[in-house]
């Protein structure tokens, strides 16, 4: 079938991964400064690569990887899941010799294409499989709490155990407590197994979830995977991945009583009644013990195992019943997750009411993984990006950028798309699909212009990986305050969906720090105890420096940590109790870009000064002169959308700032003019001196790469979107080509022009006089015409690519059976079975074009 093949027309491109980001184009500098960062493979975006049923073959693997490489992908992470209906004969059992052969083929192809190979350490999630015996499966405890006469022997009581537990439950502890009126309270604690099976498991991966608190069980689990590599001579991947902790109801392990006594200094058995009744201290100690066990017996052991085989680990710690900072810091690449779409209110950004869900990961949640990376000196923080950003088939490139920019400002610099489904090249559209959108693959119409997004990511991450973090404050993570709350339910999992309930005060503190113009990283007890004060700064064991530490008001701290903080203060460290703005300003310089104008930023230091990533995620343009918190004399703007450098107007520490709603920039500051590439220009004024509205002129509209074929061209008296033009146009997906002519006088031809496309649905490549000037794929949809416009007649060609929404709705109306995956198949954003037959036509194309001169 026809696919959306990537074609690269851009005149502004990134050089090879091991070269520098070099701008090519008439308005770009001819040579980049030698002190600016190199672009590496790690700066490119990665893909979570779903293998449905592991039903892959070498020909299609090579085709897929080739398409990913052409689009600008730098890494793939293989995650096998459930298969496709009626395709059982093609399924490949996980870790079988055939499966390992496919992995070797991927590794060989990726070496040729310079793509990094990663894989989940199992199928679906969490860790588990058929090789996990019930004795090593996730464990739980429950109690039967009863009141009986004191003359009754507790051992004689026939406790009412739930039927579903009788086969697995073992009496672990029986305790009696005298009560008034000749009664006694008897508590029986039973140990059982959750019997949770691996979610979304692939063939050969179905089985029990492993006990993450049991070091022996985890070791046995990893040994099974290791055996498959050793027996087949398959090279280990670059990276092993672990998804978010979703081991539900696992609140116990057989060794917990002894581990508790060793770590907490008293026997939990002696406090069983207090534990059952939810005593805050006892439950907090229990939760801390679980945290220690998942950290040491699972996360650290898994990472050590990967290192033994020359691999590294990438981990989502959220969901763990642990101090997230400790678990994130125990791996090589901590990874956070976005889940839903943030409503920033950006002007001109399309909204799709009823087809999106709120983003559970606000700035405070996104900062957990970057904090661990910063504090422990790890170079990369990754992200599971765009999970459930919108409903299936309705996600645009423009909707991706704002939430991505927020992740960048939180500290992410090594993003992964969630996700991409392996689908055979010739499978009828829409091919194989994963149930949680988005779909970043050649099966999606937006793939045509996805290389523009890929290039943007690569350029941003090149700078976000350069240098060192330069956040102002450490903030003590008050995990014990959280552990001491909601104690009737022993298990406390720190998943992104419930953090607003578990840590509302902490979230408020972090957002207040941000609004005051500062940035911060979270720190745990363990990492704080190894932090010292030297040279006027707090310095972590990894060498990351901070101007002070903020202790949230009234939080519970262990005595040794409290004494260490006091000792740091006695040495001269700035210790701030609460988060009073004045106290913070006495310790560090705020960034008025944040406090006055609401911009989101992250600042990093480098050998020559500092650099910023700045995003205007507000509903208004920002044009102002603002002081910077740093003192360098020279500034340079880098636009990662266009790959163009310009001199920044930086006078006596005041920066002239001009960012439209939705725009982002990189600012480089140094005390040397060596930062300037050869031929760099001054920043151009954005003041318009005239407009030419060509919306109502004569236009032609034709189609390329569309499915189904429209079969005709249209002559338009004014611009309009094409879903209203007829039955075939209303259901097609692909690219509509708008063409017109405009005449310029001699005086107008001397002006510098931009082209404003208004509300693009969804991305638009623009050619003027057959010269490609750029792709408008994100808000604001404005492009620089460079010197393409001439005196007299000028041809304008705009290739607009729409979403696949109208196409899939048409298939549902016709009863086409494309939902052919097993298990959960395809569901809507609320995890419900659905049809798209009732969707109204989604706008496709453009309605306005204005040339703006200055």
Identify the function of each model-found stretch:
Residues 627, 742-769, 776, 796-800:
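Aromatic-lined ligand-binding clefts that engage carbohydrates, nucleic acids, or primary amines
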Residues 81-199, 203-211:
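Acidic/aromatic-lined carbohydrate-recognition and catalytic surfaces
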Residues 164-230, 651-690, 791-793:
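Extended acidic/polar, glycine-enriched regions
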Residues 674-675, 801-810:
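Short acidic/polar inter-strand loop motif in beta-rich domains
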Residues 32-75:
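Mature N-terminal segment immediately following signal peptide/propeptide cleavage
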Residues 1-29:
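Bacterial Sec-dependent N-terminal signal peptides
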Residues 34-39, 720-730, 815-854:
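Non-catalytic, glycine-rich low-complexity segments
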Residues 45, 57, 61-62, 75, ...:
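Carbohydrate-binding surfaces of carbohydrate-active enzymes
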